[in-house]
Amino acid sequence: MFGFLDDLLNSIGDVCADLSIGILNGSGGLWTSAGDVVVRYCTTTPEGFSSSAWSTSSVLFNTFQAVGAALLVLFFLLGWYHDIEDVRGSFRMDNVLRMGIRLAVAEGLFNSTWTIATGLLSYSGQLASGLASSVSTSFDITDTIKGAMDLADTPGNHLMTGFIFLIAAILCSAIVAIVSTQLILAVTKRFFKLYIAIPFGALAIPSLAGGDRYSSMAFGWIRTYAGYCFEIFVMMVALAIANDLFGAGANLLIGTSDNAFIIVIGTMASIILPMTCAVAFCNQAESIVRQCLGF
């Protein structure tokens, strides 16, 4: 009688363990796919991501550049107006030279806005591509779960361990689905911001001709655009170190314990912590870039 009951408890525990393995492997496949999408998008140019959106952004930039040419003259005149103390003093050699240099620099940057914008994109993409090979988003927990089940010394513990694994696997799969979606959205949102930001550079850069009083508009655009460009590098760094940093700590916890419950907690931590860490870094990538660049 008790032998049959023990076999039943062991069988139910094994079924729960097998279900948890299947659920976690499915979640692992989802996370791996999300990581592959992120790596591919981080190493893809905005033109390669959506050629139609890039074409629209280019047309809009050319339109804004025509307006920017007029703004260049306007900001120069406004800067001249605010800098002069009297009409006679405004034509001194030092004033004329200073305003001439300011206008020449502003005009040169204005004419090179598209080149600078695409150059920053290309450079940030090369940085991200260099880290792509070191990014790993895969995991396999089959042996870990089976090892924990083998540590259960009684049928009751065997059943409880399998049941705990099943509940943890369900919760873990829900978390994986959420963070995978957030990770993909964080990367795709960057392209949308780039498509919007690039055309407005043609309107912001001419403010340099107005001097300190108006140049904050241009510097604001440069800070924002640089943050959009280089945040993919932060995303790739987050993906590269998250699994090694947090996953290694959780795996160390698993490897030094013979308690099934601790192994369950360590297994879930080895899956969830790298993901949540990576998503947190990706969501704050722009602010991290600004802090690193002193913006």
For the regions a language model picked out, list residue spans one by one.
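Internal transmembrane helix-loop-helix hairpins in multi-pass membrane proteins, together
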Residues: 33-64, 84, 110-145
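Hydrophobic, aromatic-rich alpha-helical transmembrane segments
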Residues: 59-63, 92-99, 162, 166, ...
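Hydrophobic transmembrane alpha-helix segments characteristic of membrane transport
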Residues: 71-107, 200-215
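Non-cytosolic segments of integral membrane proteins
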Residues: 12, 16, 20, 104-200, ...
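Binding/recognition "hotspot" determinant
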Residues: 1-71
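Alpha-helical transmembrane segments and their helix-start/interface "positive-inside/aromatic belt" motifs
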Residues: 1, 5-20, 93-113, 218-229
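Hydrophobic alpha-helical transmembrane segments
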Residues: 65-77, 168-176
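Alpha-helical transmembrane segments
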Residues: 206-223, 288-292
